[in-house]
UniProtKB/Swiss-Prot annotation:
Keywords: Calcium, Chaperone, Disulfide bond, Endoplasmic reticulum, Lectin, Metal-binding, Repeat, Signal, Zinc. One of its GO terms (molecular function) is unfolded protein binding. It comes from Caenorhabditis elegans. GO terms for cellular component: cytoplasm; endoplasmic reticulum lumen; endoplasmic reticulum membrane. This is Calreticulin. Pfam families: Calreticulin (PF00262). Residues 193-301 are annotated as: P-domain. Residues 302-395 are annotated as: C-domain. The keyword Hydrolase does not apply. It comes from the Eukaryota. Molecular calcium-binding chaperone promoting folding, oligomeric assembly and quality control in the endoplasmic reticulum (ER) via the calreticulin/calnexin cycle. This lectin may interact transiently with almost all of the monoglucosylated glycoproteins that are synthesized in the ER. Probably by controlling the folding of extracellular matrix protein unc-52/Perlecan, may play a role in the formation of fibrous organelles, a hemidesmosome-like structure attaching muscles to the epidermis. Protects dopaminergic neurons against oxidative stress-induced neurodegeneration. Sequence repeats lie at residues 186-197, 205-216, 222-233, 239-250, 254-264, 268-278, 282-292. Induction: By ER stress in an xbp-1-dependent manner. By aging.
Amino acid sequence: MKSLCLLAIVAVVSAEVYFKEEFNDASWEKRWVQSKHKDDFGAFKLSAGKFFDVESRDQGIQTSQDAKFYSRAAKFDKDFSNKGKTLVIQYTVKHEQGIDCGGGYVKVMRADADLGDFHGETPYNVMFGPDICGPTRRVHVILNYKGENKLIKKEITCKSDELTHLYTLILNSDNTYEVKIDGESAQTGSLEEDWDLLPAKKIKDPDAKKPEDWDEREYIDDAEDAKPEDWEKPEHIPDPDAKKPEDWDDEMDGEWEPPMIDNPEYKGEWKPKQIKNPAYKGKWIHPEIENPEYTPDDELYSYESWGAIGFDLWQVKSGTIFDNIIITDSVEEAEAHAAETFDKLKTVEKEKKEKADEETRKAEEEARKKAEEEKEAKKDDDEEEKEEEEGHDEL
């Protein structure tokens, strides 16, 4: 046990933190560049939201204007490559407004990104985080490979409540990855298998063709089966119980014809019975060959330059709070950071929100009861007034 603890301590001590932002005070505005790409971007403000533990620790930057694009980014202290290393991108998101449509993701870019002109088309290495619009609730993990943005093929569902949630992306040097939500694994796999970064290893043989005599019919008509002689019956017949109305005039109404009814003896279209096809060979499978266009890449995970992170978002309803950003080469360091920030907030925040929700529910219930009582009292008053008027009229 002591050895394991020592290893954990050594891992954290030797870890490199490339970027950390906790938005503890107003100085964040000096570090985060407001894009000038357009002049009507939405504004971020410093806020811990409605429910928090320690305000200075739990505050982050919050979107503050509805139906706005947001574009703000920050540089790292130095440019670095993650070749041969693990890379961890981690931050918290709280959709306090009960978001209906809007992004909550980050874009992590090269060091040469122009933050003053940061916008939706600015190249990035990785885009990661939750995105919600209507019923769609997904975690984006988009990797840029050779100039093209590639979406993960697996579905990862994000959280959509009004509490703070921790999102973690881990890129490993063996071309594997893991996405965590609130410290729990949400998806793992291979970069090559879960993204279309490389051409397929195998393709259908263009020279292969299904043989002309290949029979894929598992069952065929029984050639010896014959239709019974009494099979053919009309689908509809005249109703034998129908009688011509007594007032029917053939000259005026035309010749009377009984209505048609379904024929109980009708058997439908005859089809011969099916038997096993003795020539059946199964479903023909197109043979595959090695794809000459495929070349393995052991460095799908690796980018030569990392140097900036930004929020490039659209939100219909504002109120999302971002906080506790860390980019490091150590999973242990990211976990330690979460323990000092997210873990200390989540329980208190949930308890306070549940208490507030219960108080709101009780207040609404009391208001409803009061409205019903007032309605009933008014009804009684109206009835008394009506009775008095009727008594006055009798006098």
